[in-house]
């Protein structure tokens, strides 16, 4: 079973990733040296634990967004996705096909005006008695 990480280690790692994301990598040794330069960590053992958890989180971030950690690159990607407007609409309203029953219903209830995009199509009725042969 793995070792339990304290709140201090998790908090410190989270802050380091949020503030210095581009400097950290998936390699423990480089993260250890980076943590040493960026923060004043009182002991070697604590520094190694923080660097190890940073490495763990960086590997998780590579797979996808991690809950509780927000860094600038991730926020920019999220904004791009939210503000994306397609060139052509997915819902094309060039032509809408309706059958005679729907047309009558629209005219009677809504006093529906004639719109050029709406085309009335004869609907073929489904016959229950016809059977398909399996030949």
Curated annotation (Swiss-Prot):
What one GO molecular function would you report for this record?
A: structural constituent of ribosome
The protein's UniProt keywords, in alphabetical order, are: Ribonucleoprotein, Ribosomal protein
Which PROSITE patterns does this entry report, sorted A to Z?
RIBOSOMAL_S17E (PS00712)
According to the UniProt record, one GO cellular component term is: cytosol
Which biological processes are named by the entry's GO terms? translation
SUPFAM superfamilies named in the record: Rps17e-like
Q: Any stretches that span the bilayer, and where are they?
A: none
InterPro entries attached to this UniProt entry: Ribosomal_eS17, Ribosomal_eS17_CS, Ribosomal_eS17_sf
The keyword Calcium is assigned to this record = no
Concerning its family, UniProt says:
Belongs to the eukaryotic ribosomal protein eS17 family.
**Matches recorded under NCBIfam families:** PRK01151.1 (NF002242)
UniProt protein name? Small ribosomal subunit protein eS17
